[in-house]
Each structure stands twice: as C-alpha cells, then as structure tokens.
C-alpha cells in the first residue's frame, strides 16, 4: 500500500501482517520527500515505485537499493531528465507552468513508458531517464492578473500570485486508453 501525506512524504508499507501486534511504523518506508501525492508502483517490475511531490517533483524509487532518483522532465523539451532536486523549481522555467499536484501515469501498454504534464505533455520510454515533449501548450495560458476576483482586477501586490498559489493554465490529469496505445486524454 502506498500513499502521500501533506508535508510528510510519500510512503509505502504492508497492506496486512500476520504479526500479532499488527503493522508498525517501522514497516513503512519513504519513497519521496516533500508533500506526498500519488505513488504508483510499476505494475510489472515491482522494483520501482514512482512518486510526485509539490510543483511537479517526480521520483523513481528503487526498492532494491532503497534510493530515489529525481526524474522530472526538464524545461524546454530537452531530453535529459532533471537530476538535481526532486521538485526542480516552480514551473520548470522556459515559460512552463506546473500544477501543485502535477499529473503523471505509467502507460497500461508499456510499463517503462511514463507521461507527465505541466502545460505541455511529456513522454519517456525509459522510466524517466530521458523525456520528449510530445505536445504544444495544451492550456489557454490564462494570466491570473487579468481574471477578475470578487468582481475586480487587483493590483500585483494585492495577491501573492507567485508565492502562495499554484500556476494557472496547467494540465491537471492525464490518462491513456487501456485498449488503444497512445490514445491519451489530457
């Protein structure tokens, strides 16, 4: 069983036990830091567990070594995965915007294929070691300073748009048809 916890990582542990004292805290292990979201175990190779943290951090956790590797796609559609830090910074730079809980999936057709979204969709066929941007900006690219709140436009210093809110105009979910490889819903 795996799950995310606010401010306290993503963790995995046993779904049950034959021990008379039940499952203990020591039975659980951390697979990713930060704010934990949805860890997804590789459905074929149980060695790997993928997990996300705030603002798009994506990690591949290796159960054999007990170590995680940051695999967040880099900004700008380049191929090498971001290797420094799990979160990789707000939005990833390069004009990219990322949701607080950025979506990702493991393809139901190929367990080494991952999809991850910010305002673009990225694909990896090698468990996140490299990425390719596979879409244009899929959002309306709304500027929060141009959206009325409570019936008016607010000055830049009235609301901390970049300090305490998630980016607007981001992908919030990704799914792939279980019947047709490559048919994606974003």
Model-identified regions with their sequence ranges:
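Beta-propeller blade termini and top-face loops
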Residues: 1-186
């Amino acid at each position: 069983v795996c799950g995310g916890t606010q401010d306290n990582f993503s963790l995995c542990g046993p779904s049950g036990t034959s021990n008379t004292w039940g499952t203990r805290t020591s039975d659980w292990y951390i697979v990713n830091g930060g704010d934990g979201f949805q860890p997804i175990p590789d459905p074929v190779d149980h060695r790997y567990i993928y997990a996300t943290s705030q603002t798009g951090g994506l990690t591949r956790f290796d159960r054999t070594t007990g170590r995680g590797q940051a695999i967040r796609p880099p900004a700008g559609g380049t191929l090498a995965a971001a290797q420094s830090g799990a979160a990789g910074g707000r939005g990833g730079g390069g004009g990219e915007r990322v949701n607080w809980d950025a979506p990702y999936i493991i393809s139901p057709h190929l367990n080494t294929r991952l999809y991850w979204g910010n305002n673009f969709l990225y694909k990896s066929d090698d468990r996140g070691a490299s990425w390719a941007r596979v879409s244009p900006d899929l959002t309306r690219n709304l500027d929060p300073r141009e959206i009325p709140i409570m019936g008016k436009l607010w000055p830049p210093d009235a609301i901390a748009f970049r300090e305490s809110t998630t980016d607007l105009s981001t992908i919030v979910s990704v799914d792939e048809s279980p019947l047709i490889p490559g048919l994606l819903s974003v």
